Amino acid sequence: VAAAIILPFSVEQEHPIGWIIKLYSDTLSSYAYATLNTANWYYLLSANWAQLTLLTGRALPIATGCCALLPLLALATSCIRKKQPFLVRLLRTQNGQISLLCAVLSVYLFVVAAVGCTWSLYGYAMMALVYGTVILCCLHHSDAKHLPGFLALLLAGIYVLAVKVHERYLFPALGLFLLGYVCSRDRRLLWLMIGFSVTTFLNTAIVLDNSILYGSSLGHLNDDTLALNVILCVLNLLLLGFGAWVCLTPDWSAA
């Protein structure tokens, strides 16, 4: 489908294949900010419109790295309590592999904290965590009925935890949540669709309202709605946490 859409525009291009890659590359490079008016993790960290090359300070990557070790510690504790082989669960189970992924992220964050962590180094690592988690869940739950829900949760994870994100980037996920419910009958996906619809609507409404009132240069998540902005950020983080549970247990509703 993507090729059919791109092909008509490729005929007159000097580089029939490379032009689309360059277009996306140039577009992404123009968004060199931690977040762009999005009620997500980075807005809570006061990084709205913060240049990606700016340093985050050491506290953020160290704190995140410590939190990323918790799944591994929980797995080890569970193995000791149940007298199960740790390496088998670590390498062969979904939760074990995700725990290992988090541990790798933790080591990376400790290293960049020591040498100087920028928003780009931090944000791309969080993006890799989201992609890795969803891919592992897809591998362990390969039934096609789960795919729309996984894709929606991937977009939600990127929306909340990745850099270079606009407030409108979650729109496709809302339709995928609904499609995921139709395919899997998991009502949790409906709750996620409703929750993210509310936060995204309010987020976008604030930005558009400010653009109309003050012009495009001031059409942002400004301090005059700071309390609401923070509430939306917290709600999105809570929704993502709920979404992580859905992602890890896609067959829960059928149990």
Describe the function of each predicted region.
Residues 1-22, 31-33, 42, 47-255:
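Multi-pass membrane glycosyltransferase architecture that uses lipid-linked
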